[in-house]
Regions:
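Short small-residue beta-strand/loop micro-motif enriched in glycine and branched aliphatics
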Residues: 40, 111-113, 168-173
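Active-site nucleotide/adenylate-binding loops and adjacent lid/helix of ATP-dependent enzymes
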Residues: 1-75
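Phosphate-binding site of ATP-dependent enzymes
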Residues: 47-128, 156-157
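A short, glycine/Asx- and small/polar-enriched loop/turn
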Residues: 24-27, 83-84, 151-156
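Short beta-strand-to-turn element immediately C-terminal to the catalytic PLP-Schiff-base lysine
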Residues: 16, 43-48, 81-83, 150, ...
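ATP-dependent carboxylate activation and anion-phosphoryl transfer catalytic cores
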Residues: 7, 119-188
Length: 188
């Protein structure tokens, strides 16, 4: 709601609590995920109506509110923002499936390309949106914003903002900093 009211595009979707009906307008495939938490725990891509109850139950086991969104066939991009300025953009490419917990934390399961192989114009669009998210959330030091870029039309959709992203030497923000010539010691 905050992103939409700030003019930041998000995938079409609805927030549900237990017992709420899923509007038919969502259709399939769709993405079901807890409203809070992280690392894609409790997140499912649902391709058939009969799999929806199980996906909802899994998401509700993580949170009392669940988001059901239209599935968008897209490239996944992420960008850090430090002190209000967007950093290099990374494209995230899981070897299989989507960027779930396993693909995030098991070595070799995901390719992270920095800088992302997108046009200069698209880079600026993603960075500008990330800065707007940073401002809308009134973030202070740093954060990271995840986006989808629709493969059909290039539209950008904000998935989420991470207000305390990982800062290990192999985390995404340090990779962005390295692409800009900043070493890990300077960053931290």
């Amino acid at each position: 709601i905050l992103f939409r009211s700030s003019g930041i595009p998000t995938p079409p979707g609805v927030t549900l609590r237990r017992g709420d009906a899923v509007p038919e307008s969502i259709g399939f495939p769709c993405v079901v995920k807890p409203c809070s938490g992280g690392s894609s725990v409790g997140t499912s891509i649902v391709t058939e109506p009969e799999k929806l109850p199980g996906a909802l139950e899994e998401a509700f086991s993580c949170d009392e509110a669940v988001l059901v969104e239209k599935y968008i066939r897209a490239r996944e991009l992420t960008v850090g923002v430090m002190d209000g300025r967007a950093m290099a953009v990374i494209e995230i490419i899981p070897k299989t499936g989507f960027y779930d917990y396993k693909n995030k934390y098991q070595a070799g399961f995901t390719e992270e390309i920095c800088p992302a192989p997108i046009s200069a114009e698209d880079t600026v669009r993603v960075q500008h949106l990330a800065e707007r998210v940073y401002e809308a959330l009134h973030l202070d030091a740093y954060g990271r914003v995840d986006f989808l870029m629709d493969k059909a039309d290039g539209e950008l959709y904000c998935l989420e903002a991470n207000t305390l992203p990982g800062m290990t030497p192999t985390s995404l923000i340090p990779q962005m900093a390295a692409a800009e010539g900043m070493d890990y010691g300077e960053l931290c």
